[in-house]
Amino acid sequence: MFKREEIIEMANKDFEKAWIETKDLIKAKKVNESYPRIKPVFGKTHPVNDTIENLRQAYLRMGFEEYINPVIVDERDIYKQFGPEAMAVLDRCFYLAGLPRPDVGLSDEKISQIEKLGIKVSEHKESLQKILHGYKKGTLDGDDLVLEISNALEISSEMGLKILEEVFPEFKDLTAVSSKLTLRSHMTSGWFLTVSDLMNKKPLPFKLFSIDRCFRREQKEDKSHLMTYHSASCAIAGEGVDINDGKAIAEGLLSQFGFTNFKFIPDEKKSKYYTPETQTEVYAYHPKLKEWLEVATFGVYSPVALSKYGIDVPVMNLGLGVERLAMISGNFADVREMVYPQFYEHKLDDRAVASMVKLDKVPVMDEIYDLTKELIDSCVKNKDLKSPCELTIEKTFSFGKTKKNVKINIFEKEEGKNLLGPSILNEIYVYDGNVIGIPESFDGVKEEFKEFLEKGKSEGVATSIRYIDALCFKLTSKLEEAIVTNTSEFKVKVPIVRSLSDINLKIDDIALKQIMSKNKVIDVRGPVFLNVEVKIE
């Protein structure tokens, strides 16, 4: 907390002095907590759900009402809608199946098996029979069976499960039996049911839409087909409705997603639930992608199918695959990777990788941490001293009643050199997935590397960590360790940097894995010629 009154008094006496001196009150974050190692974290929506919401709003803007169509459809409805074609259509449907409920009796043999487990049945026989009978009749849910058996016999649930496994093996041998119910393979099967029920409840014409999941038994999933997908479908019912309504709706809907110019081409499939010569494929031009794309299908339902549902007016239906539109909007090449990104490789951008490059060792004590900045400034200021030369920094630290006098001596004894090597001011950048050390100046850099390094500096992400910064933190971290362990002296020598660890840096395993898998590089090589002796008294 600031001492506000003292600051105001200081400012009243000498504003300029107060303005400069109070800057020290704003404490800088420690290196591993500073930018770019801290980065904003945003929630992320899924492209399919984004597209669903955009489609919902697009339909609503066009005056449609939203409905949820049945997901479970009886196969009889498929026959009513498709006629003779139904058998071929049902091949792509998933049927719902369930386990039958076995007629399990409580024979003398079963009672004997239970009693061999050390459980007396005689007093509880009637209760146990009622439970087994209730399960067979469907009045008792399967997931309650073990609990009810345990309660009836006054035993633990673990023992109840053992009885179910060992005495009633019939439950383990059950095989699912298919019903006549299917999972909706396309939205049309639900529209017939919905429109039929609304005919006497809503004034004509009416416009409905539904965006929901469908299930299709594909032979295999590939980059453009999944066994479950979302259909964004609409239906318009009323006198005078025809394929012109389909064309207008297609244009109105898809123009909201950046498409311009539309082609309407007769669909060769000719599904029997559509009136002949009305089933139409919609191709739209996307100026950003500069190509024509098939994006929707529409048609007018056949009077034959409509009549079976008590519908006596034309109904136009248009549908499009949400995943298809999301792939176009997001420029995805594989629907599987778009829908299930968690099962595919996650690519980190340069900004993300830069946030994962951190100092390995950092002093904990504030006094020693603060010494690091002084050390860095002195090294930068004196880096070009001609050898033989040395730079000495002395500090006294107080820890309660104990004082420690520290003498740090940075030196170069060999003649004809500088105090520190030419790479000492190199800074770590992340560029095109690579982690590289880039010099402050490109003087003397070989032409074959110069263009890459220049691009790295102008287009890459700077970590704001120089070699000298990281090395000085390594030095003060060792100093802190020496003070704590009562070590009187130590040396640090780093002649040539070959890896991140040589300059006290580390990188997150996630980033490292990507760098290796993408054949990217970590190249921080360079001469720093750091020689240090530290004495503590």
Swiss-Prot record:
Positions with a binding annotation for substrate: H186, M187, T188, S231, A232, S233, Y273, Y274, N317
Catalytic function, reaction form: tRNA(Cys) + O-phospho-L-serine + ATP = O-phospho-L-seryl-tRNA(Cys) + AMP + diphosphate
GO biological process, alphabetically ordered: translation; tRNA aminoacylation
Matches recorded under InterPro entries: aa-tRNA-synth_II, aa-tRNA-synth_II/BPL/LPL, O-Pseryl-tRNA(Cys)_ligase, Phenylalanyl-tRNA_Synthase, SepRS_C
One Pfam match: SepRS_C
Gene3D superfamilies xrefs: 6.10.250.3340, 6.20.250.20, Bira Bifunctional Protein, Domain 2
An example Gene Ontology molecular-function term: ATP binding
Annotated EC: 6.1.1.27
Assigned keywords, A-Z: Aminoacyl-tRNA synthetase, ATP-binding, Ligase, Nucleotide-binding, Protein biosynthesis
Oligomer and partners: Homotetramer. Interacts with SepCysS.
Primary role: Catalyzes the attachment of O-phosphoserine (Sep) to tRNA(Cys).
Family per similarity comment: Belongs to the class-II aminoacyl-tRNA synthetase family. O-phosphoseryl-tRNA(Cys) synthetase subfamily.
Protein name per the record: O-phosphoserine--tRNA(Cys) ligase
